[in-house]
Amino acid sequence: MAGQFDSEDRGSWYWGRLSRGDAVSLLQGQRHGTFLVRDSGSIPGDFVLSVSESSRVSHYIVNSLGPAGGRRAGGEGPGAPGLNPTRFRIGDQEFDSLPSLLEFYKIHYLDTTTLIEPVSRSRQNSGVILRQEEVEYVRALFDFNGNDDEDLPFKKGDILKIRDKPEEQWWNAEDMDGKRGMIPVPYVEKCRPSSASVSTLTGGNQDSSHPQPLGGPEPGPYAQPSINTPLPNLQNGPFYARVIQKRVPNAYDKTALALEVGELVKVTKINMSGQWEGECNGKRGHFPFTHVRLLDQQNPDEDFS
């Protein structure tokens, strides 16, 4: 299902001069397809489309072009009137306006997601325009007993402090007793704990042991959009995708679909939550859409690269 946001409402998605680190702080942990547009910190007049996708935040450079396709000088903002008409380029695609660019990526994949909704302004108004050094917390969705000595066991409902993200699916965390170890990302959700929990986890105050900023300085590296990958229309029937990331669902969730890299999945339903439904190896269930990549629907059995 395509995003339902109003691309003409610039106030909902344009954040102006926002640092890369602040963009990451706003988008990290948000559902896939949540995005914002900000001014480029390195090239005046250009913009950056920052998007939450695949357990990371990607940044796509959007170049401002003059009427003849040349670079435009100055930074007027996406809605400011200019003396010359301006076009915008992302990857190999060009658009007459930023709203038309956003409309395109409502139904076309950037890399692993389409654009679903702008990040909420309430995160800024409520003081969550997180400082780059602010600690991130997660809440456990399931019990985890740990498989190795380096793992951090926890119980459902536990609040953990994230210290590092060395892998996409495994983060380094600390519990309320000060124990540290690796935790599986699918077992937790981002949260804002009570002040009491924060006090316990931080030893009563914020010290200098904060994680490093999450996005790195501008410029780049910038992601490149994967063009010509439209979101299929299920009115034309189911479509096929190839598994790109293994998934071992929780044993208690009988509706979750287990996935192995390379398997073919028949997608039967797209949900805005990012949980798709489909069939694989004769079994039906739901799975995160970030674990698969769409195939050429005319030749779904061809080797996937």
Swiss-Prot record:
Supply the SUPFAM superfamilies for this chain. Answer: SH2 domain, SH3-domain
Give the source species.
Gallus gallus (Chicken)
Family matches, as PANTHER family:
ADAPTER MOLECULE CRK, SH2-SH3 ADAPTOR PROTEIN-RELATED
Q: Where is this site: Proline switch?
A: 238
* Domain SH3: residue ranges: 133-193, 236-297
Give the multimer and partner information.
Interacts with ABL1, C3G, SOS, MAP4K1, MAPK8 and DOCK1 via its first SH3 domain. Interacts with BCAR1, CBL, PXN and GAB1 via its SH2 domain upon stimulus-induced tyrosine phosphorylation. Interacts with several tyrosine-phosphorylated growth factor receptors such as EGFR, PDGFR and INSR via its SH2 domain.
Q: How is it modified after translation?
A: Phosphorylated on Tyr-222 upon cell adhesion. Results in the negative regulation of the association with SH2- and SH3-binding partners, possibly by the formation of an intramolecular interaction of phosphorylated Tyr-222 with the SH2 domain. This leads finally to the down-regulation of the Crk signaling pathway. Proline isomerization at Pro-238 by PPIA acts as a switch between two conformations: an autoinhibitory conformation in the cis form, where the tandem SH3 domains interact intramolecularly, and an activated conformation in the trans form.
Describe the location of the SH2 domain by residue ranges. Answer: 13-119
> Could you tell me which CDD domains the record lists for this protein?
SH2_CRK_like, SH3_CRK_C, SH3_CRK_N
Principal location listed in the UniProt entry:
cytoplasm
Taxonomic lineage is:
Eukaryota, Metazoa, Chordata, Craniata, Vertebrata
Q: Name one GO cellular component term.
A: plasma membrane
Gene Ontology MF term list? ephrin receptor binding; phosphotyrosine residue binding; receptor tyrosine kinase binding; SH2 domain binding; SH3 domain binding; signaling adaptor activity
| Keyword Cell membrane in annotation | yes
Output the InterPro entries linked to this UniProt entry. CRK_SH3_C, CRK_SH3_N, SH2, SH2_dom_sf, SH3-like_dom_sf, SH3_domain, Tyrosine-phos_adapter
Described function: May mediate attachment-induced MAPK8 activation, membrane ruffling and cell motility in a Rac-dependent manner. Involved in phagocytosis of apoptotic cells and cell motility. Involved in cell branching and adhesion. May regulate the EFNA5-EPHA3 signaling.
Annotated positions of the Phosphotyrosine modification? 222
One family name in Pfam for this protein: SH3_1
Comp. bias (Polar residues): 194-211
- Family (UniProt): Belongs to the CRK family.
GO BP of this protein:
actin cytoskeleton organization; cell migration; enzyme-linked receptor protein signaling pathway; ephrin receptor signaling pathway; negative regulation of cell motility; negative regulation of wound healing; positive regulation of substrate adhesion-dependent cell spreading; regulation of actin cytoskeleton organization
Region (Disordered) spans which residues?
Answer: 194-231
Localization, UniProt? Cytoplasm; Cell membrane
Gene name tied to this protein: CRK
Q: What UniProt keywords are attached to this protein's entry?
A: Cell membrane, Cytoplasm, Membrane, Phosphoprotein, Proto-oncogene, Repeat, SH2 domain, SH3 domain
* Entry protein name: Adapter molecule crk
